[in-house]
Amino acid sequence: MTKQKQYVSDVNLTVCGSNKPSSTPGKDIEYFGLIPVDLFISNILSRLPLKSKAKCRCVSKLWSSIIRRPNYNQLFPIKSPAPRILFTIEYAGILFFYSSPQPHNPDENSSLVATLHQNTGNTKFYEICGPVCGRVLCRQYNSVGVIYNPITGESSNLPKLSLKGINKSEWLCDKARYSFGYDPIEKQLKVLCITWLRTGSEHLSNEYQVLTLGTENKKTLLEKDSRLCNSFFLGQY
């Protein structure tokens, strides 16, 4: 029986292994050759299930940076998995995320098995947008938007909403509306956020902001009394 160890060089990203018989003390350790990064990723990492791949990010910062690249699938193309349908069930304020294979022929009578992935636990959400590129946008009761990965359970809070020239203590009625989408030109996930204030029937102020995920970029499109429309949609089609 042999025990295998692996490590990663932060300089060249090469993987090597070593084994030593546990029943033979003092025997020299045998080393395997270095594995090139492209061979390692294309033949090992890319074949792992998504949950196992998520655990690999804990090996080193270098592994994590490679796996989390926005263009990872373009640099190391792999066979796309079969499309799946995402189900979200809300119970007592908790969201449960399920998925099942998408049927090839929806007209046929066939039973599908849904797999439970994650739930939001004690975090209470009341609104959900998406999914877009494997992520959804959830809304908390305190109007904070959260980008959530239903497979890995990772989440990222959006910046707190604010309106220029308005003292927060003077807010009488504030609302916000989010829409989640993908920019195919810049290849970035973006959130369109509209915030506005009203007191009774009087319109006070509103802003249109675009948030880009993965950066600190927050671009204000319009503000103050810019009234374009009462509804909008941003997403893939």
Swiss-Prot record:
InterPro entries from the UniProt entry: F-box-assoc_interact_dom, F-box-like_dom_sf, F-box_dom
SUPFAM superfamilies recorded: F-box domain
Domain (F-box) ranges: 41-72
Cysteine pairs bridged by disulfides in the record: none
PANTHER family (UniProt xref): BNAA05G37150D PROTEIN-RELATED, F-BOX PROTEIN CPR30-LIKE
Name listed for the protein in its UniProt record: Probable F-box protein At1g53815
Organism per entry: Arabidopsis thaliana
Lineage of origin: Eukaryota, Viridiplantae, Streptophyta, Embryophyta, Tracheophyta
